[in-house]
Amino acid sequence: MEDFYVEDYLVKGDRYYTKEHEWVRVKNGFAEVGITDYAQKQLGDIVYVDLPEKGKEVDAGDTLANIESVKNVAPVYAPVTGTVVEVNEDLKDEPGIINDDPYEAGWIAVIEMKDPTEVEDLMTAQDYAEYLKEIVEEEKEEEVEVKEEELIETESIEELSEEELGYEENK
C-alpha cells in the first residue's frame, strides 16, 4: 500500500480514515487510532492530550479524547465501536509527539472492535487523499495534486557529489 502526499500532508497507505481526520490501523480485531498529519498541522503545537480511560466503551462518533494546542481544543472521535484497551501514556508527558510523528509514536488509543467490518464504512488512504485534496484546494483556492510517495523525486545522499554535500575528501 502506497503512502500519499497532498501538498505537504502525509497520508499513510496502511490506514483507514474519517472525515474528521482520524486514522485507524487495524490488526486482529483491534483498531489503533490517531489523528492525521493534516489535523496535527492545523492544530499547531499540541500541549495536552486528555486520554480516554482503559475499559471505556465507545460508539463510533463518540468523543474518544481531546487535544489541546496553543490554538485550539479539538475532540478526537472514535472511528469504530468497541472498548478502549490501551492508551498512549507517553502523550501525558510529551503531547508534542503527535506533532512529531502522528502516524506512529503519536497514536492515541487502541480499541478492541465490537464489529471489525465497521472499518468498511471508513475511507481508504486513497479516498482520504482525494477528500483532503478537495479541502486543501478550497483553502488555497487553487488546484493541488495527490502524489504517491514513490513518485516523489528524491536524491539519495550517495548520488550527490562531494561538492553538493558541501565537503571534499581529505587528501
Curated annotation (Swiss-Prot):
Q: Does the keyword field hold Glycoprotein?
A: no
Among Gene3D superfamilies, the record links this protein to: 2.40.50.100
Domain of life from the UniProt record: Bacteria
Q: Where are the transmembrane segments?
A: none
For whether the record's keyword set contains Cell membrane, the answer is no
GO cellular component terms attached to this protein's record? cytosol; glycine cleavage complex
Cystine pairs? none
Return the cofactor note field: Binds 1 lipoyl cofactor covalently.
Gene Ontology biological process terms, A to Z: glycine decarboxylation via glycine cleavage system
Among InterPro entries, the record links this protein to: Biotin_lipoyl (IPR000089), GCV_H (IPR002930), GCV_H/Fam206 (IPR033753), GCV_H_sub (IPR017453), Single_hybrid_motif (IPR011053)
Q: Which cofactor does it need?
A: (R)-lipoate
The region called Disordered is annotated at 139-171
Q: Name one Pfam family in it.
A: GCV_H
Q: Which residues carry this modification: N6-lipoyllysine?
A: K71
Q: Which UniProt keywords apply?
A: Lipoyl
The Lipoyl-binding domain covers which part of the protein? 30-112
In the record, the note on similarity to other proteins reads: Belongs to the GcvH family.
Q: What does this protein do?
A: The glycine cleavage system catalyzes the degradation of glycine. The H protein shuttles the methylamine group of glycine from the P protein to the T protein.
Q: How does it assemble?
A: The glycine cleavage system is composed of four proteins: P, T, L and H.
NCBIfam families assigned: gcvH, PRK01202.1
Q: What is this protein called?
A: Glycine cleavage system H protein 4
What organism is this sequence from? Aquifex aeolicus (strain VF5)
The taxonomy runs:
Bacteria, Pseudomonadati, Aquificota, Aquificia, Aquificales
